[in-house]
């Protein structure tokens, strides 16, 4: 049986797949439930939370975006502020890889917290030698 991670970092790709009832959303729901049952922290950078917010606001409405963030809070997701340590690590990922800056924050948080990053975004293949990834598929 694989060892449980110290924590999970949720990328916006994972959260949006859950919110929009995409195929990977069911696995995200299971990861969240398993994490709560096993007292494994669920983390998300505020940068990635903002990404979820603006994408949801564009596709639906600002009210739906606010509700989505509230759902994450109710699931027990801890929003992690972008301090200098996290921002510098994100900058290091950005300097070395061709990926969005928001994705660099998710990777940096997972690396700094020794957590498993939950995503299906293929941009993260570039950093999988430095970050543990729980891959999702749609």
Please place each PLM-identified region on the residue numbering.
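Short, well-structured N-terminal submotif of metal-dependent ribonuclease cores
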Residues: 1-44, 57-70
